[in-house]
Amino acid sequence: MTERSEALGKDGNRRWDDKSDHDDVTKIYVNYSLMGIESIRFDYVKSGKPIEGPFRGETYNTYTHTFEINHLKNEHLESVEGSYTQRGIQTLQFKTNLRISEPIGYPGKDGIKFILAVEGKKIIGFHGSTYFRLYSLGAYFTRVTPTRIEAIGGKVGTKWDDGVDQAGFTKIHVRSGQEGIQFIKFEYVDKNGRLRDGSIHGSIYRRGSPHVFEIRHVDKEYLVSVEGYYDGDGDCAVIQALRFRTNVKTSQLMGPKTGKKFRLAASGMKIVGFHGYAEKNLTSLGGYFTPIIPTKSECQGVTERSTLWDSGAFEGIRKVSVTWRSYCIRCFRINYENDGKVVKRAHGMNDDSRITDEFVVDYPYEVITSIVGTMNDSYVTSFVFKTSKGRTSRTFGERTSDSVEFVIESKGCAVVGFHGWYAPLGAGYITALGAHFYPMPLPPAAEKLEAQGGAGGVPWDDGSNFERVRKIYIGTCEVGIVSVRFLYENDIEEIVVGDHHGNKNLLRHEEFDLDNACEYLTSVEGSYDVIPGSEDVEVILMLKFTTNKRTSPCYGLDDDPTFVLHKAGHRIIGFHGKSSNMLHKLGIHVLPITDP
């Protein structure tokens, strides 16, 4: 059911309406000047097809700001905040379930604030009015439907569905037996914060092994995935084992590793409900998922007679840079991670004549978890950043005698954005600071070992989301290794084909095949040197691979190894490196070797 809000602002003489027959808003274009928001345009998506909307208002002599919403990653527009005067809409700021845009426009002294939002719903269309510029804005809302992943396993027994009216889980009860999972039961917290005891799905009238997995919902712990095994033919299959993972911890495997492996998970989302089939055993299990939502802290510092700024929320932070003088922070710069791209933001006055230093974060293996700062009655005087690896940055600025300490953090969360205030009229110093937080995921289980080889080439990384290496393709020529390509196996036994790294037009091509699930890669030997006839181009000359069972032939030139990629007690599950039309460097991702 679609809900239409009233258009807020001043009434312009040209009314417009984008209607509500869209699935999501995908991109917003805002043209603005000192007079206010001059024009606006919205792009939408409907049944997977993009729809470009027209500009509403005039576009002469304006600044332009765009804000993209990635509906393919379950991002949707939740609200619009702004202000208006007699001259129309002056400022706008857009909030999705994942991020917040920068404030757009220039706030007037007598501006009236407004917000377009309906709890539990998303915006799918806009309407409003113009009179040369944008005068009013309203929206269409529809309910956000959780993503349903169909039940995996058999379909024998009673179909059950716990629904999606819960905010999270507190406890999961499972009993396993010789024939599979006998029953499962969930304890929930509803959206009003009340505990709710779920129904038993399966049979309780047999002996088995009980398992209980507790989830601390009050500490912002939430369920992100379920994996397990099912065995049997078609609709008669039975769930044999289950393992639950939250953003904080992973349960033991409840039951034996028997049959085919499966996983219930969705990137950037958490589980809010389950459904499936059960008879005397649990025969199948499916889930409902909703996006994980960032939170915003209050600002620490002085907000009076200052200008508001807000970077919004991103995937992570790669680097912070701070410029300061003896008594205040002058400029705060942040490099954010946004879907594989670096987004740069700067707040305050960029003054290169002052002291500047930076703090680099090893994202995604490291995140900022808190900021310890000091402030006096006028401005922020110092910052210190702390990370998930236990690192602490230097002190940016000075802790003066009249300063008071403050801490910005949210337990179990990572900092994914900053907001605050700075002094106007050319002063530029930071007067207040706050942060956007996102529940902290488990750090990548794999360890990334530094690549070995020569300089040159473009970086590449196959990642570490694999269980083992299945096959290696090596391209060689008379001067060394031309290219490599790896086939991997993921945790549900699917084959993942990696990219070609190097020259695809191979002169000679060789393969090294790992036999079965019991064989895994433990080390790589290699050598590198300058290409004959070149002064500085270093390439990999030779590679040799060792598994827990055997050693491969020597690929490339017959050369003595100059490096070894290996970590004791670990197996190789991924590769990274640098390449051009040759292979320049090679590195590995490793996991600890565990008993089968």
Curated annotation (Swiss-Prot):
CDD domains: Jacalin. The gene is JAL46. Residues 1-20 are annotated as: Disordered. The keyword Translocase does not apply. It comes from Arabidopsis thaliana (Mouse-ear cress). Residues 2-143, 146-291, 294-439, 446-592 form the Jacalin-type lectin domain. It comes from the Eukaryota. InterPro entries: Jacalin-like_lectin_dom, Jacalin-like_lectin_dom_plant, Jacalin-like_lectin_dom_sf. Pfam families: Jacalin (PF01419). Belongs to the jacalin lectin family. This is Jacalin-related lectin 46. The keyword Cytoplasm does not apply. SMART domains: Jacalin. One of its GO terms (molecular function) is carbohydrate binding. Keywords: Lectin, Repeat.
